[in-house]
Amino acid sequence: MEPMYLQVLQKETGRQIKKLLVENGYTVKDVQNAMGFENPQAVYKWISGRSLPSLDNFVILSRLLHTSIEDILVIDEDIVRLWGFSFKLIVQ
C-alpha cells in the first residue's frame, strides 16, 4: 500500500473549535475545567490556531462537543493512494 498524505490546517481547525464551542454554549473556561487545566492558555492557543490539541485532548473535546474528531479537524486536499489509484479528496 502506498502512503497517504494529508495536511491539517491549524488556523482553520482553531476557527472550527471556536465555532463548535459557541454552537454548544461552551466558554474557554468550560473547556479548561473539563480538561483539568490550571489555566486556559492551551485552549486559547487551539482557538487561535497557534497549536493543536493532543490526541487525548481531541478525544475529550469531541465528547464535550458531541461530535467526532474528524468534524473538528479541518484537512486540506487529502491525496489518498490505494492499490495504485490516486483519489483527491477535499474535506472541510
Label for each model-derived stretch:
Residues 21, 32-33, 62:
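The alpha-helix within a helix-turn-helix
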Residues 49-63:
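Short, basic-rich loop-to-helix N-cap that marks the start of a DNA-contacting helix
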Residues 15, 26, 38, 53-56:
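Residue-level signal for the short linker/turn that defines the boundary of a DNA-recognition helix
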Residues 18, 29, 59:
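Residues within the helices of the helix-turn-helix
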Residues 36-53:
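Recognition helix of helix-turn-helix/homeodomain-like DNA-binding domains
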Residues 1-7, 73-92:
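Short, charged recognition helix plus adjacent turn
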Residues 1-26:
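A short, Lys/Arg-rich alpha-helix, primarily the initiator
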Residues 17, 31-32, 43-46, 72:
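Conserved hydrophobic/aromatic packing and binding residues within compact polymer-binding modules
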